[in-house]
């Protein structure tokens, strides 16, 4: 019995063991299949990310500058222009030293110190800016998602909709076709399919992100090898990396290697086909990339009834079907979250050029770098931030017969590109844009000879001798001495500004810029300030206002004597016509006298005038001398351009500061012994009597946010700024210099 039991158990044990073994085998095979599947998916994903099929490692056989500019093929008397964009190539990527191909291009060509995207730093707006030279507010593509109820009742994703009416400007391919009739080809560039000008590229295949990079190269080379009558004179091409890797914050270095390999293959193909020295190649990008670390959902803070919300690292709110005002809605989130700025189109800084079009929205919400106004499990990096964020900065490299060798162009904003394209295609000056003609002259082999404009501003009509007419009573001043000074001082005929609408009044070291229509409030003051320890540090204490009887025999009628917009503190600076009664939210004049003597670190202001006055005074102490231009401007339609109509109420206040870090040659006009010693800083502030996001910003943050270029000031104040002793190129760089930090 026991033996039978043993036999039975032995059979069961054997059967059980075989079943277990079979399960192990099946499980193992299943696991192997699963792992193989994961590997395959990984390979497919990698191929999808890069869009390439095992590109060979870069060899750089094309490198070297021995034959630079020596095209050996007939039919290339005018070099074709190839513009190649790598989406999301941050300037920071260059520091990783992975994309050696770009370094080699720069050795034989040119590069930019850095390129600032336009605001917001998104793909669609900036790609269209690069080919139109217009800010997004002007060309219509104000974001990757656009809301325009006149065209469509919902928020539209530009990448999904054939909405040609959204593309309002003329891109370079359209201008070239219209003006020359020659051929243009486009490979996936934003707007190639939808612009409404009527002049489309001759060849523009449908967007296909899966098209392998090798095939894209073959396409470009094939186009360049066409017979001269069929060959495009302009090619624009777009590649979606390294942007996708940047968004995922994974395999960025691997993707940069792919980009490097791609450029190497392209350059080798150009070299092998003897095209390298016959083509002007410009490599650009639209923006950088920022790692995300914070998410805020606007819907949980703001009542969204009747509103349209566009999400992103910049959130935009459109008032659509609501009776609430812009200020009411903005007030629901303004100053409620640390580090979040809530602007309306009325108070957003002019330098962002984001108020002209209704498509920008009514309220623009920005957070600190790393903050997004949406939730995503996969998006670990993004862009769209203010170009003051250095992670948004990007690159430009160029090589070809028209470019100098091993030259760096100073930092610039991407609105400048259009004038470069027009010059390289022989069409300079034919299309208006937001760039400045001549900005890129320093990188070109044969730039045009450009001269400064020598227009001079007229002196205002005068009535006789220069004497002081005191406009408010003050004791202890020697009016005769001041009158003698006005009568005998040298007049400044060589002022650094010109305007056909204005004239100047000479006040010795200073000049008053007056609108020829005396009823118009627009005016400015030029001051040459020198610091001395005996200088009265209070702007208004013991000073008095006056006019020069050479230009006026009566004082202006104002309700206050305190609201001067001059920077100096001496009596000579208290020009009565440099008075304007600012709203209390702009200037609390009764505080200035007692506060200017305090140390900056002990004060935190939310008004504009006080921190600006303190900062100007601080700079004067530090540098010893300052050239200051301050004034009032009118721009009611918020397009950044001075209004033509007469106005008695200014909308903006501006100030330009210029100093020398070395020796001065002149203070008015401001001129340093060495141009490289010149420092310039400009501001444009809205004049508003309402709550703004400035109420919850510290003084330095306010000042930095409302910096601008000198050209921005020129446009809104309706004058031209130029220092005659500087070259045309130096004046352009000075006027278009972008400030990303205070002095």
Swiss-Prot record:
Segments on the Cytoplasmic face: 1-23
Pfam families reported for this sequence: Phosphodiest (PF01663)
Residues forming the catalytic site: 123 (nucleophile)
E.C. no: 3.1.-.-
Residues that coordinate or bind Zn(2+) 1: 87, 123, 286-287
Recorded topology in the membrane: Single-pass type II membrane protein
Recorded GO MF terms: hydrolase activity; metal ion binding
Membrane topology (Lumenal): 45-743
Cellular component GO terms held in the UniProt record: membrane
Signal peptide location: none
Residues reported to bind Zn(2+) 2: 243, 247, 383
Cofactor binding: number and manner: Binds 2 Zn(2+) ions per subunit.
Keyword Magnesium annotated: no
Disulfide bonds: none
Compartmental location: Membrane
Entry annotated with the keyword Aminoacyl-tRNA synthetase: no
Keywords for this protein: Calcium, Glycoprotein, Hydrolase, Membrane, Metal-binding, Signal-anchor, Transmembrane, Transmembrane helix, Zinc
Chain residues that bind Ca(2+): 635, 637, 639, 641, 643
Transmembrane regions listed in the UniProt entry: 24-44
Cofactor(s) recorded in Swiss-Prot or TrEMBL: Zn(2+); Ca(2+)
Function: Probable phosphodiesterase.
Record family assignment: Belongs to the nucleotide pyrophosphatase/phosphodiesterase family.
Protein name: Ectonucleotide pyrophosphatase/phosphodiesterase C27A7.3
Species this protein is from: Caenorhabditis elegans
